[in-house]
Amino acid sequence: AGKSTLMNLITGNLSPDRGEILLDGKNIKDLGISYLKHIGVVPQQQNLYPTFTGKRFLYYMAALKGMDKKRADLEIPEILNMLNLTKQQDKKIREYSGGMKQRLLIGQALLDHPSILIFDEPTAGLDPKERIGIRNIISGFSEDRIVIFATHVVSDVEKAATEVLFLKDGLLLPAQKETQDWKDKKTSLEEVYLHFFGDEGMSL
């Protein structure tokens, strides 16, 4: 549907063929590497280091982001506590459940207090209990920053999103009326989905 391409454009991994992506009125291409300070990314693939402990992984990611150790020492315990990983911080990542790994990926995205969080299929492969937990975490972050997440799971969007965009064949669908009806609780998001896609696949 073009979801991965759109996410790569927003994160700066791809450059648009035409048009521009703006942050506070500035082209992200002109912002250069400083743009990366504004974003935290939770990728779809859980590419973690199985022999690292959770805590070591966060310190490693903090170093890659250019954070000094003093600041990392302040942030990492807070993040581990927020994501309910303090008791597991010294366990090897290979011992983590899928939900714990996802929380750890969210933790690295939170390092250095980004103003934009980007999630790509954040609940893929999780059991229902883990999915609800991750969804609740994402909802909590939206109070003080921009949260963008791409998913095929309608229930995740229904519970966690305040704005919805539909992608089909790489194009954004003109769905302002339908999404406004959803926000006004005149219809469900599932009904909006069926209106546009029927039995086809989609990205949100």
Q: Language-model segments: which ranges?
A:
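Catalytic Walker B motif of ABC-type/P-loop ATPase nucleotide-binding domains
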Residues: 117-121
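Helix-to-loop junction immediately C-terminal to a conserved catalytic motif
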Residues: 11
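Conserved ABC transporter NBD signature motif
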Residues: 19-30, 34-35, 174-176
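Conserved ABC ATPase "signature" region
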Residues: 59, 63, 70-88
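Conserved beta-strand-loop-alpha-helix hinge in the C-terminal portion
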Residues: 171-194
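Helical segment within the ABC ATPase nucleotide-binding domain
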Residues: 131-143
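Conserved ABC ATPase signature
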Residues: 51, 92-96
